[in-house]
UniProtKB/Swiss-Prot annotation:
One of its GO terms (biological process) is translation. Signal peptide: none annotated. It comes from the Bacteria. GO terms for molecular function: structural constituent of ribosome. The keyword Ribonucleoprotein applies. The gene is rpsB. This is Small ribosomal subunit protein uS2. Pfam families: Ribosomal_S2 (PF00318). SUPFAM superfamilies: Ribosomal protein S2. Transmembrane segments: none annotated.
Length: 272
């Protein structure tokens, strides 16, 4: 369960929606009231939605899944890149490139190109066999690719789930995820459609503090999932290394010819 209180959410301004004239009627059930022409979100319902999203992400990661963090609006860029990096998950904080998921094979080739360029020494004009101008152009290419794809450079396959800060801003990313059957967790403000994603979180998607709070929570869910995953691995490893009981060894040698028993016992020792 997510470690968050109503006080945390209020201080982060998560209850402020958009102007009443800009609302999406599908958000009606998550709106508590309106004040000075602004919709106020029902944070009690938001808390339940956060818990569901948190548990989903935790379970996804615990079962060897990956979560792609997406937030390209200015208010979200720093939080998305920092929190995804904290838990070693891929992210997109710059412009979403069309086909980033649906044409993943081509995108992967561009990532390979980025890694290739990162191996180059752009100051070694003599050793590279290239001119200064050629090296400068290659360095610019590397910088451009790093900005566009740096967050997914270690994403070897399409993600198991996606966390999005603003479903309207990231409509293309959400669309691509749905085409591939990838579940989406998203912050959904009063001007958005909560039915467009599997795990909506009704909240202000413009306040920097609010974005940081929710993005950090989802990263915490990833961290818990990773701990659970490593715990399962350690348990499985421990069970594999558990020495064979005496009665189990007897079963292996029971009824074996006396002359062959020592050889079999020796074989058991090697196997262990």
């Amino acid at each position: 369960m997510a470690q968050i209180t109503m006080s945390d959410m209020l201080k982060a301004g998560l209850h402020f929606g958009h102007q009443t004239r800009r609302w999406n009627p599908k958000m009606k059930q998550f709106i508590l009231t309106q004040r000075n022409g602004i919709h106020i979100i029902n944070l009690f319902k938001s808390l339940d939605m956060i818990d569901k999203a948190y548990d989903f992400i935790k379970a996804t990661v615990a079962h060897n899944g990956t979560v792609l963090f997406v937030g390209t609006k200015k208010q979200a860029q720093e939080a998305v890149s920092a929190q995804a990096t904290r838990v070693n998950m891929p992210y997109v904080s710059e412009r979403w490139l069309g086909g980033m998921l649906t044409n993943f094979q081509t995108v992967s080739k561009r990532v390979s190109r980025l890694k290739e360029l990162e191996e180059m020494d752009f100051t070694d004009v003599h050793g590279s066999g290239l001119t200064k101008k050629e090296l400068l152009l290659l360095e610019r290419e590397k910088d451009k690719l790093a900005k566009q794809l740096g967050g997914i450079r270690n994403m070897n396959r399409t993600p198991s789930a996606m966390f999005v800060v603003d479903v309207n801003k990231e409509a293309l990313a959400v669309e691509e995820a749905h085409k591939l059957g990838i579940p989406v967790v998203a912050i959904v403000d009063t001007n958005a459609d909560p039915e467009s994603v599997e795990y909506p979180i009704a909240a202000n998607d413009d306040a920097i503090r609010g974005i940081e709070l929710l993005t950090s929570l989802m990263a915490d869910a990833v961290a818990e999932g990773l701990l659970e995953r490593s715990g399962k691995a350690a348990k499985a490893e421990g069970e594999a290394e558990q020495p064979m009981a005496a009665w189990e060894k007897e079963l292996l040698t029971e009824g074996a010819p006396a002359a062959e028993a020592p050889a079999e016992a020796e074989g058991e020792t090697k196997a262990e």
